[in-house]
Amino acid sequence: MSMNLLPWRTYQHQKRLRRLAFYIALFILLAINLMLAFSNLIEQQKQNLQAQQKSFEQLNQQLHKTTMQIDQLRIAVKVGEVLTSIPNEQVKKSLQQLSELPFQQGELNKFKQDANNLSLEGNAQDQTEFELIHQFLKKHFPNVKLSQVQPEQDTLFFHFDVEQGAEK
């Protein structure tokens, strides 16, 4: 398409077209650079987000483990219960007496000792064995309380709470 323009106008028209082409090319380059910069920024943000999510998951796992440990400690130590150390001699004496319990075929399942008390749980094969154990405890400890006796299949389940003190 050719216009009938004066030569100086043709020259100005071509100059404007070149300038327009230059501005369009400059705009396209600027748009490409902005697009690359934003895509690079988005990629960095994705990497940062992944790193933060991984860190969050690790912290969450640590929190869960710590919470579990706290719960276990709360179960182990009741609120208001004061922990006191038990003299070695008292522990040795208690263990010695436990080893002398007259078990024939029964067994001691659970033993708990604090400063003044013992708690014993176990099974006796029959009534005779249970009576021997009960007599032994009454002979060696001042205050023996039978908390529970429950017949199970072929055995008797028992729970004694024993107050320690001077031997009888």
Swiss-Prot record:
Keywords: Competence. InterPro entries: Competence_ComB (IPR016778). One of its GO terms (biological process) is establishment of competence for transformation. It comes from the Bacteria. Involved in transformation (genetic competence for DNA uptake). This is Competence protein B.
